[in-house]
A protein has these predicted regions:
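Generic secretory/membrane-interface signal
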Residues: 13-15, 116, 141, 146
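Amphipathic alpha-helical segments
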Residues: 38, 45-46, 56-139
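Amphipathic, charged alpha-helical segments and their helix-to-coil junctions
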Residues: 34-37, 44-47, 51, 126-174
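A short hydrophobic/aromatic micro-motif that marks alpha-helical segments and, especially, helix-coil
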Residues: 17, 82-85, 122, 156-159, ...
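Generic hydrophobic/packing signal
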Residues: 17, 21-22, 65, 112, ...
Length: 174
């Protein structure tokens, strides 16, 4: 697999924000070498995701004005939200892996399937946010909920922009 696609997959892991998840890497090397390479990449992605998740939480903690009482109630809900977001993120990683594996041989049907499933993942993220608005609002004010989701969306937008800049365009396939 070329370096650009490998970098794409590692960056994709970053976009998923929290928790260790899996990743497969296509390789023409011997199976044992491919397995070792995949394990190393999986570990890199897991560490990167944990680091980004931690930094996101620090960013929110530094910018979201919470009283001690609010913080005690907010952070468990945030952790639950982040865990559900990471599960959706697993689907995003799977799509990026599939895209990387099909790069250079992708058919029209495969391209359409990938974009439809990618949009479905985006929709799931939006639905998760909608689901959590009233849950967060039970523990903090409406303004705080709105501010949290502004930061959450800004953080994700930055990652998405970086990721999009690294993903080769479908029509650019050899």
């Amino acid at each position: 697999m070329n370096k650009k696609i490998a970098a794409l997959i590692i960056l994709a892991g970053a976009c998923l924000i929290c928790g260790p998840k899996t990743h497969a890497q296509a390789s023409t090397a011997k199976p044992a070498a491919a397995s070792d390479s995949q394990k190393a990449t999986d570990q890199d992605i897991a560490l990167l995701r944990q680091d980004i998740g931690s930094k996101k939480k620090q960013l929110i903690a530094a910018n979201l004005k919470l009283t001690d009482t609010e913080a005690t109630k907010f952070w468990p809900v945030y952790d639950q939200y982040s865990a559900e977001l990471a599960k959706i993120g697993d689907q995003k990683v799977a799509l990026i892996k599939e895209y990387a594996n099909q790069w250079g041989t992708m058919t029209d049907d495969q391209a359409l399937s990938l974009i439809k499933r990618s949009l479905a993942v985006d929709e799931q993220i939006a639905q998760l946010r909608i689901k959590y608005v009233p849950i967060f609002n039970k523990v903090v004010s409406g303004k705080t909920v709105a501010t949290f989701f502004q930061y959450d969306r800004r953080f994700q937008a930055l990652i998405d922009i970086q990721l999009a800049s690294q993903i080769p365009v479908v029509q650019d396939q050899p």
